[in-house]
Amino acid sequence: ETVAPSTATTIKNTKFPHLLIRTADGNFRFTQIDGSSYTISATSYDVPSLGERVCGDLTSAPDPSFIGKKLNDIFFHRNRLGLLADENVIMSRSGEFFEFFPETVTSTLDTDPIDVASTHTKVSILQHAVSFDEELLLFSEQSQFMVTGGATLTASNISINVTTEFEADKRVKPVGSGSNVFFTFNKGNFS
């Protein structure tokens, strides 16, 4: 397998969220996800790089749907890095946090990236994601969704279902606590 001619293979790391890395000397380093290496206090660090398209074309291995869109939230769920952009949930390959392209286009693997839109009759721009009770809750301004799948969450078994339809303030991220999830909403001049 190879990449089709004239097909872009990379995601611009300047448009992707940056990393904050705690170094051995107790300080923090803010850096792009660019694959660079550096040494501090005799400790070497290798910054990860964004994965590249290694096979297929824009149809068989499409660009992740977050490209060119504003990211509303970043999260981890079931060993995947996740992003919310518009109505989409985008998750990396399982265990490979910066890989958003499939390894192969000849078959579907359980580890493949996930890129799925919410299914609702209303426009639901997803604002926040909260891992809760081994599931993932998604919040838009007027609806809440639950991401479900099998014991292993894959691109072929994922589903996003509406659970409730309460207003939620997009400026405040919901918080899970015990068996509850707390989120704010506006009521007049109060939250």
What is the predicted function of each stretch?
Residues 1-67:
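Long, charge-dense tracts
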Residues 46-79, 84-191:
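Beta-propeller and closely related beta-pinwheel folds
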